[in-house]
Design a protein with these regions (language model features):
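Active-site-proximal binding-pocket segments
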Residues: 56-237, 243
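Glycine/tryptophan-enriched, flexible segments
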Residues: 1-116, 224-291
Length: 291
């Protein structure tokens, strides 16, 4: 079975009237200033802070790298031997690795690196996909991330994985739908990093996260936004909830008092469904495309 992903039409989405805050300075001097700031205030703790969505724990250099305002070698030249520096070095290597993979496999821009996953059963985009685009899935950590993307043109790397997993494994949609949406909004959009980052999470890429690894959007929020500050910033409907309440508003009487969206799916049930679909193609890991 060869399933072709359809590009979602912008007219099918009903975005709220959010205020857009895309105001990013550009140029080599800006990139070098940001790199200097990160070296002084974030690099040495990168390994500890890089996954927390609500803090400034990453370099925020992705757009500068994408548009050629700073070279990866400029970053590598300043790195030492500490664990934090080594973790940052590996993240730069991921970017270069994906560029090489796409160079040798150009079809993987929109096609599967592991072709077996074409055979999996997928659903067609519907109102649940629209809810994902709009940040109205009913899962606060997912919704905060999607609203951050639309409002700012950027999304934290941790939440990119979380929302990708939600689209592929909770909504059972092909990864290309999400990859195209990212391409419409990311200021740092890089074809290789985007397509293969999505395929990594979807389980069909190079050295991919196993498909059976399904990110729990509730636990991810509790772990990487424990106090809920990131959620409150982008989901004002939940600002009245405490840290203990904000990740599962459906459990509390006033969780929906400000009009927050109800859950479009039940994560526990969809996780089971996702694994059942995997068993149908009998592929618990991606296959080498040369086979």
């Amino acid at each position: 079975m060869n399933i072709k992903a359809l590009e979602p039409l912008a007219g099918d989405r009903n975005f709220p009237d959010w205020n857009t805050d895309i105001n990013i300075s550009a140029g080599e001097n800006v990139a070098l200033d940001r790199w200097q700031e990160f070296q002084s205030n974030g690099l040495d703790s990168y390994d500890e802070n890089r996954n927390f969505a609500g803090i400034d724990g990453t370099s925020r250099l992705s757009a500068h790298l994408r548009w050629g305002e700073i070279h990866p070698r400029t970053l590598l030249a300043k790195l030492g031997d500490s664990k934090a520096h080594d973790v940052f070095r590996k993240e730069i290597a991921w970017r270069e690795f994906y560029a090489d993979v796409l160079h040798h496999n150009p079809h993987t821009t929109w096609d599967y690196y592991a072709p077996r996953f074409k055979e999996m059963r997928y659903d067609e985009p519907d109102s649940k996909f629209n809810a994902w685009c709009e940040g109205k899935t009913g899962y606060p950590f997912v919704d905060a991330a999607m609203r951050q993307l639309v409002q700012t043109g950027w999304m934290h790397n941790r939440t990119r994985m979380v929302v990708a997993s939600f689209l592929v494994k909770d909504l059972h949609l092909e990864w290309q739908h999400g990859a195209r949406f990212f391409g419409q909004h990311l200021i740092d959009f890089d074809v290789a990093s985007n397509s293969h980052g999505w395929q990594w999470t979807a389980g069909c890429g190079t050295d991919a996260s196993p498909y059976y690894r399904v990110f729990n959007p509730i636990e991810q929020g509790k772990r990487f936004d424990a106090e809920g500050d990131y959620i409150r910033k982008y989901v004002p409907e939940l600002t009245h909830l405490s840290a203990a309440e904000i990740h599962e508003p459906w459990l509390y009487l006033d969780g929906y008092s400000n009009g927050y969206a109800e859950r479009v799916v039940d994560h526990a049930a969809e996780r089971i469904e996702s694994l059942a679909r995997l068993s149908e193609i009998k592929a618990d890991k991606p296959l080498d495309p040369r086979v």
